[in-house]
């Protein structure tokens, strides 16, 4: 029997079967996809083959994971060589960002975007809590939106509290399985409650001491839109503190920064790393202001990930 994983509680997986029934399943101990060292062998969005519970008390279990169309993956933790898969078989991803309380850095944004580019997952940036922004915050919001829209990433300015911008965001999610990700405290749960009122997710507060969010979502789950096309759903994920990249070779990192990759076609050397080489068209474009300095800094930070000891958790 086949189905789709719609919830991961850590010890069990809720699978929606092709006949519409939902079953909690265990994962076989040797269940791993070839070539992936993951802390979670099964991810929400995975298409799986399951064996139902037997009459002799054997619980239902996941026998096989079907090949993934794509996924979003990150380094599991500091100095770790293992990965954590946030979601699989995605049509899109929404990265929820905030200018303040907590701050979403451009390095964090760009690491997420580069990973999504690597696995061909289109990303929408949703800047939340705009009802709380000061004039200075608004200026920063406009600066960031200008950078990312110029590259080709849609930017939505939204408020889960007032509802501003939500219709535009929701229209981009119609007919899609969309991963929702971001730091703890950026308002992911509040945003889902505003987009899908029946979701009724628990929301949390910001730590005033550290200006960071406190986890309210502890497991990943798929939530259907009742008022959009069939197949429209969000995957809610726990807050991410840092985003370490994986599986990116030194000479391919630039491929996942569209504006850097476009400029690199003019480089003198085919193996240019865009850091110091003579005749580097990327460095020239950077000097002319055609590439944002923040994006280039993020590019350099991913190059450093080859040395795991230099991974910095604030990303």
Curated annotation (Swiss-Prot):
Binding site for GTP: 128-131, 182-190
Domain CP-type G: 79-243
Recorded GO CC terms: cytoplasm
Listed EC numbers: 3.6.1.-
Location within or outside the cell: Cytoplasm
Keyword Kinase: no
Top EC class, one word: hydrolase
SUPFAM superfamilies: Nucleic acid-binding proteins (SSF50249), P-loop containing nucleoside triphosphate hydrolases (SSF52540)
Protein's recorded name: Small ribosomal subunit biogenesis GTPase RsgA
Organism whose genome encodes this protein: Porphyromonas gingivalis (strain ATCC 33277 / DSM 20709 / CIP 103683 / JCM 12257 / NCTC 11834 / 2561)
Classification lineage: Bacteria, Pseudomonadati, Bacteroidota, Bacteroidia, Bacteroidales
């Amino acid at each position: 029997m086949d189905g789709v994983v719609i919830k991961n509680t850590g010890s069990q997986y809720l699978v929606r079967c092709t006949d519409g029934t939902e079953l909690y399943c265990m994962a076989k101990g040797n269940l791993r996809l070839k070539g992936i060292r993951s802390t979670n062998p099964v991810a929400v969005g995975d298409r799986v083959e399951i064996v139902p519970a037997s009459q002799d008390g054997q619980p239902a279990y996941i026998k096989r994971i079907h090949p993934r169309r794509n996924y979003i993956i990150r380094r599991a933790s500091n100095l770790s060589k293992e990965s954590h898969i946030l979601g699989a078989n995605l049509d899109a991803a929404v990265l929820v960002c905030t200018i303040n309380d907590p701050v979403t850095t451009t390095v964090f944004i760009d690491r997420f975007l580069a990973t999504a580019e690597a696995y061909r997952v289109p990303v929408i940036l949703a800047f939340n809590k705009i009802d709380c922004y000061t004039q200075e915050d608004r200026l920063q919001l406009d600066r960031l939106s200008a950078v990312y829209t110029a590259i080709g990433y849609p930017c939505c300015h939204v408020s889960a509290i007032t509802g501003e911008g939500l219709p535009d965001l929701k229209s981009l999610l119609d007919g899609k399985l969309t991963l929702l990700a971001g730091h703890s405290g950026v308002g992911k749960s509040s945003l889902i409650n505003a987009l899908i009122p029946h979701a009724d997710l628990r929301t949390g507060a910001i730590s005033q001491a550290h200006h960071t969010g406190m986890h309210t979502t502890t497991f990943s789950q798929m939530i259907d839109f009742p008022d959009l096309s069939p197949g429209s759903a969000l995957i809610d994920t726990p807050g991410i503190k840092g985003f370490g990249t994986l599986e990116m070779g030194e000479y391919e990192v630039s491929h996942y920064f569209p504006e850097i990759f476009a400029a690199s076609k003019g480089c003198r050397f085919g193996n240019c790393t865009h850091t110091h080489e003579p005749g580097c068209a990327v460095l020239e474009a950077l000097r002319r202001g055609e590439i944002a300095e923040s994006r280039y800094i993020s590019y350099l930070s991913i190059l450093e990930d080859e040395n795991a000891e230099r991974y910095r958790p604030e990303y």
